[in-house]
């Protein structure tokens, strides 16, 4: 659907070249929700602007549906942009227009007949749950309602792609969840490809199928959501994941390790999370199991569990218990320098 091939964007600033995006190669499949996460200045917003040619790449090519877009004429670009909807952190609504008028705006630009505009806008108002707000102005709406208007407006011309630029960053947690659920509905019912950028890993966790991590203009890690969360390879990705799955060792656990305690990290996936492996080894081997920390989250409808346990008993029995655990779950001994 969307392909970035060795794409770079360089700006000149104060006589120096600044690489906002550097040699990025990515592929976004049709109908998926693809997240790009990074800290401020990572280059993710620049990458988004390259998709609809608000910025042109310094090097490399970008293709949509196998059509290279960097050499399109002005007329062709105008047609391309009708296929791409966009929502923003700051909503970007016209304060002088009603909710109906905001949603209708791109349809009027496209010279759609009035009766069709009315039908389409009413359909979208119902879709985003704002049927009773058609004649309201943006100042009369909450942040979540404003973003719903933004989503409806982005969908007005029936695009194939929806770009979300920090779409939930200005919202409270409850409203964020509501907007993410609405975006899932958009993806599911309209089969839209959604390209989303954020600095919040919990947003990626809730909605994305795949994710790329950017740092200093480069993609440093990319893959399926479950793989990136459960096996983060880079330090930056690990820090993002820890904002959702806190695997830092508490001081009390570190003290136990330093005093000779045998601490192990157990990770469970899918059906493994429902297996009573700890009670089994406690009953069948002469060991005591002390659970020090644990959590379970859901990633794309698959459970992922993380436990820290201390095993106490004779070394021979502990080794037998460990042998059994290795057959059931992923197991790693935690060392004193771990954090």
Swiss-Prot record:
<dbReference type="GO" id="GO:0005886">
    <property type="term" value="C:plasma membrane"/>
</dbReference>
<keyword id="KW-0472">Membrane</keyword>
<keyword id="KW-1003">Cell membrane</keyword>
<dbReference type="GO" id="GO:0005524">
    <property type="term" value="F:ATP binding"/>
</dbReference>
<dbReference type="InterPro" id="IPR018449">
    <property type="entry name" value="NIL_domain"/>
</dbReference>
<keyword id="KW-1278">Translocase</keyword>
<comment type="subunit">
    <text>The complex is composed of two ATP-binding proteins (MetN), two transmembrane proteins (MetI) and a solute-binding protein (MetQ).</text>
</comment>
<protein>
    <recommendedName>
        <fullName>Methionine import ATP-binding protein MetN 2</fullName>
        <ecNumber>7.4.2.11</ecNumber>
    </recommendedName>
</protein>
<keyword id="KW-0067">ATP-binding</keyword>
<feature type="binding site">
    <location>
        <begin position="38"/>
        <end position="45"/>
    </location>
    <ligand>
        <name>ATP</name>
    </ligand>
</feature>
<dbReference type="InterPro" id="IPR041701">
    <property type="entry name" value="MetN_ABC"/>
</dbReference>
<dbReference type="GO" id="GO:0033232">
    <property type="term" value="F:ABC-type D-methionine transporter activity"/>
</dbReference>
<dbReference type="InterPro" id="IPR045865">
    <property type="entry name" value="ACT-like_dom_sf"/>
</dbReference>
<feature type="domain" description="ABC transporter">
    <location>
        <begin position="2"/>
        <end position="241"/>
    </location>
</feature>
<dbReference type="InterPro" id="IPR003439">
    <property type="entry name" value="ABC_transporter-like_ATP-bd"/>
</dbReference>
<dbReference type="Pfam" id="PF09383">
    <property type="entry name" value="NIL"/>
</dbReference>
<dbReference type="InterPro" id="IPR027417">
    <property type="entry name" value="P-loop_NTPase"/>
</dbReference>
<dbReference type="InterPro" id="IPR003593">
    <property type="entry name" value="AAA+_ATPase"/>
</dbReference>
<comment type="similarity">
    <text>Belongs to the ABC transporter superfamily. Methionine importer (TC 3.A.1.24) family.</text>
</comment>
<comment type="function">
    <text>Part of the ABC transporter complex MetNIQ involved in methionine import. Responsible for energy coupling to the transport system.</text>
</comment>
<dbReference type="InterPro" id="IPR050086">
    <property type="entry name" value="MetN_ABC_transporter-like"/>
</dbReference>
<dbReference type="InterPro" id="IPR017871">
    <property type="entry name" value="ABC_transporter-like_CS"/>
</dbReference>
<dbReference type="Pfam" id="PF00005">
    <property type="entry name" value="ABC_tran"/>
</dbReference>
<dbReference type="GO" id="GO:0016887">
    <property type="term" value="F:ATP hydrolysis activity"/>
</dbReference>
<keyword id="KW-0029">Amino-acid transport</keyword>
<keyword id="KW-0547">Nucleotide-binding</keyword>
<keyword id="KW-0813">Transport</keyword>
